[in-house]
Amino acid sequence: MQIGVFSVSDITRDPVTGRMPTEGERIKAAVAIARKVEEIGMDVYATGEHHNPPFYASSPTTLLGYIAAQTERIILSTATTLITTNDPVKIAEDFAMLQHLSGGRTDLVLGRGNTAPVYPWFGKNPQDSVDLTVENYNLLRQLWDNETVNWQGKFRTPLQNFTSTPRPLDGVAPFVWHGSIRTPQVAEIAAYFGDGFFANNIFWPKEHYMQLIGLYRERYEHYGHGSADQAIVGLGGQFFMRKNSQDAVNEFRPYFDNAPVYGHGPSMEDFTAQTPLTVGSPQEVLEKTLTFQEYFGDYQRQLFLIDHAGLPLKTVLEQLDLFGEYVLPELRRELDSRRPAHVPDGPTHARRAAAREASVSASAPVTSVG
């Protein structure tokens, strides 16, 4: 099980102190959080992509490239890379470059995003969202899988004898997850290509994500990539903890009540009852997270949102220390012990490169001697 954190990169006023962090402070905080993720033994750090205030992560690969130089072990990923408005050529180049810089510690989550105005900012029409997703991903796959690409589509200029550089590290493209909150077509694309499917699992009841993940698993098996329970699934989650449950509730309440997404809506008690959010003790965080496997089946990656809603960096780092000491070892042990032997581990570059090498060796012609 790969366990880590993801950020939506919001810049939000701290409702307790009234202080608004600067862009620079939030960017440096992201680096500090990623380093803490590695320090406590987590496996993944992922950042979102936004091109409007109040967010800072307009250039995820730049941020992740810097973090790669500050870390040695963790996988560096995105919470969303906008497949609809980014040029597939630039995605292919940027993430292959990040692969080389990080020594293969790179994958990405592709998604459509949730900000409609971003489409015209990049010369696209939001009504073409799904068609852009399909066409752009087909081109991205060709750019990574083929040395020379000749291609013509609807939404960008044709390519003739084009080679994307640098080439993927060891001939293995970065692993792709497809992220979706509500779009069945995205689950279909992930299943068709045998890619991973990442369910945000933050703001909706479990029944909503059970439908999307169930569809993805069914179609993954339909396309012949393996049994439904072998499909590669990632989940989000969200927590705030203190050693004493009531202390966590009291401390987090003003942040919850004023959060840009769910603030001034349902009560914190209702929201924690209806969604994956856990506010309480480390044991409560552990117990609720373990229920995800019961609802969604065996899965490979669990990421948590912990740095949003104006929470100060000091508090976020304390959350990670608590998680690393009281939750992570037991969570990893329990989830790994539940996973059947035929269900794969989370994807890594090393495993995928080894599988490719074995496949090439197996298909090589045998020459007789003598």
Go through the PLM ranges and name each one:
Residues 1-21, 115-118, 157-172, 264-274, ...:
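N-terminal small/glycine-rich loop or linker at the start of catalytic domains
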Residues 1-77, 173, 343-345, 354-360, ...:
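N-terminal beta1-alpha1-beta2 module of alpha/beta enzyme domains
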Residues 3-7, 45-47, 76-78, 106-110, ...:
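Hydrophobic faces of well-ordered beta-strands that scaffold small-molecule active sites
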Residues 13-27, 81-89, 172-182, 274-282:
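Active-site mouth loops of central-metabolism enzymes
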Residues 16, 87-195, 207-210, 214, ...:
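Internal, glycine-rich beta/alpha segment that forms the wall or movable "lid"
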